[in-house]
């Protein structure tokens, strides 16, 4: 799932301007990294990496990275995201939880939310697993949740794009139906892009029929963090 993105020469030049500052905090926790990068560097590097990963690599990961604020506000946001990530991991151990920048990259694979072949409807097990996440999402209401749907490689490109959009939408509508605010959500479908397993076995194809989340601070959380809250 991890990929190396080749940045443009301009992006590399800008990124190198902040290499020393970033290197000094590379071993820090995510809260410390939010402060150590700094406001300007956080916004610039977050924008560059988020934009490039979103176009040429994992979209959810790029969205989570691209939301960087940096500075003291970034540290406060990072602390809240650290706590939320731990609670998600405890609530649903079958999910893959990754803290990136000032956001959370969450993969709900076949162990958490499974989709049958050519289906976008949620299975009873998928609903039960989503139910485990709802209390955490409600506790951290000042976050935006972007949902990305995916398919395996079977079928035509346009069909898979539509199917992946429907999968993301199914998850969104289920969560809204459980009381989460619709304004927090955005959905996208990426079809066969960003596979996390080979598509040459039934097991691998099942893993690729998934949804991923990018959980980031909303405007209120950002403003609260800037106010030191």
Where are these regions (language model features)?
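Periplasmic peptidoglycan-binding/anchoring modules of Gram-negative envelope and division proteins
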Residues: 117-149, 176, 206-208, 213, ...
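Bacterial N-terminal signal peptides that target proteins for export
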Residues: 1-9
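C-terminal motif of bacterial Sec signal peptides marking the signal peptidase cleavage site
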Residues: 17-21
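Solvent-exposed, polar/charged alpha-helical surfaces in well-ordered, non-transmembrane soluble domains
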Residues: 86, 90, 124, 128-135, ...
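Short, low-complexity, glycine-enriched hydrophobic/amphipathic alpha-helices that associate
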Residues: 23-87
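Amphipathic, membrane-active segments
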Residues: 81-112
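Periplasmic OmpA-like peptidoglycan-binding domain that tethers envelope proteins to the cell wall
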Residues: 150-224
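Short, solvent-exposed beta-strand/turn patches at coil↔beta or beta↔helix junctions
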Residues: 101-131, 151-158
